[in-house]
UniProtKB/Swiss-Prot annotation:
It comes from Prochlorococcus marinus (strain NATL1A). GO terms for cellular component: cytoplasm. Substrate binds at residues 8, 40, 72, 86. This is Phosphopantetheine adenylyltransferase. Reversibly transfers an adenylyl group from ATP to 4'-phosphopantetheine, yielding dephospho-CoA (dPCoA) and pyrophosphate. Pathway: Cofactor biosynthesis; coenzyme A biosynthesis; CoA from (R)-pantothenate: step 4/5. Homohexamer. It is found in: Cytoplasm.
Length: 158
């Protein structure tokens, strides 16, 4: 089975990587779809985020990374995905993700959204938290892969 894992991944965190690994174990194939959203100012370009993800997932079998614009269900259909994979950190995530899952089903009822709870030690992680800690010079190497930490440090020293 092929799971579509959509997101901005700006930047990719160890929480994302955990979900990708578990998705690979469960479904065999994970298509990581990096959203190109021109109305949102990204920290890293879509191209750089794809490079970061490809580097971080090179040892996880069945992973592929693409860019996408538009609706998640259209991306799933165009790439022959069987399901949509999403992670949940807290109840607040569930409320939002359930709304998105229902919207996706209303647009194309072929796609189920499968939710995986994050590992407890990753439950505080979000890309926004990582960027905020990095902005103030805090330690982030326990939150993101080393090369992403270096990318963020470069941005914050310029």
């Amino acid at each position: 089975m092929k799971a579509l894992y959509p997101g901005s991944f700006d930047p990719l965190t160890f929480g994302h990587l955990d979900l990708i690994q578990r998705g690979s174990d469960l479904f065999g194939e994970v298509l990581i779809a990096v959203l190109e959203n021109p109305s949102k100012k990204a920290t890293f370009s879509c191209k750089r985020r794809i490079e970061q993800i490809e580097n971080a997932t090179k040892d996880i079998p069945g992973c592929r990374t693409i860019a996408f614009k538009g609706l998640t269900v259209d991306c799933a259909r165009e790439n022959n995905a069987d399901l949509i994979l999403r992670g949940l950190r807290a109840m607040s995530d569930f409320e939002y993700e359930l709304q998105v899952a229902h919207t996706n089903r209303s647009l194309n009822n072929q796609y189920e959204t499968i939710f995986l709870a994050t590992e407890t030690h990753h439950s505080f992680l979000s890309s926004s938290v990582v960027k905020e800690v990095a902005r103030f010079g805090g330690e982030i190497r326990h939150m993101v892969p080393e090369f992403i930490a270096k990318d963020l440090m470069k941005l914050n020293t310029n």
